Amino acid sequence: MNNHRLMQRDLAVLWHPCTQMHDHEQIPIVPIAKASGVWLTDFDGKRYVDAISSWWVNIWGHANPHINNAIKEQLDTLEHLILAGFSHEPIVTLSEKLLALAPKGLARCFYADNGSAAIEVALKMSMHFWHNQGETAKTRFVSLSGSYHGETLGALSVTDIPLFSQTYASLLTQQYRVPSPDWTQAPDGVTPEAFARQQFLAMETLLAEKHPEICAVIVEPLIQGAAGMKMYHPVYLQLLRAACDKYGVHLIADEIAVGFARTGTFFACEQAHICPDFLCLSKALTAGYL
């Protein structure tokens, strides 16, 4: 196999994600033969640094020996098992370890397939909870301007990046948006904390007026990644947690990108000293292995 041959085979059978395939008529695909640590190697022996961590996923390096050996050992014992009516030791051990690391107040783990599915589960669980409480008018969600929460229809409904959602607008449910506390939008001389407090007024007003129909607020804590790494002050999360408690609304923390120490604390929510009602994880949870 060589680079050119694999590129030909690829273009004959694959559509790549987040890609205009016509671009690859002029811009070659990078074919990779193997990887180790941060290095990717093509079929001609040229090496590349995986600086995007394969889309923010690979936190332990490619072909990590410890992980490789653990997976090989597990494959000889049990490769997969339905969790409806069954259990196994690895899933219980993982759940125990995750809960020990998570903000205090989170008590159960639920597993889905990927990040978008994690968001879908959180949205559904929130609505289901309120309906079980007799609060059947609660069917709406709130997200921030510039938010990104995934590519499936429910996740796209709480996403505010037209590049991803505009084409499918007629399929999406209508949700509430409030201005982001992204500090790059702050006037000169305004501190990140002051701007976050100012921007929170719109959220407070919406929750005060519409909380009878709102299930949850969903946010990317501290950093809105797909919007361009837009950052905001932790005080916004503190104010949001208090307001969600005040108005009877869930708080969903989408830490799919920022979880697992990417912001300096193990979870970004820890910098605000809050516990969300739902904590959505993916990416670094499996480091791309599973």
Residue positions per predicted region:
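Conserved N-terminal phosphate-binding loop of PLP-dependent enzymes in the Aspartate aminotransferase
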Residues: M1-L290
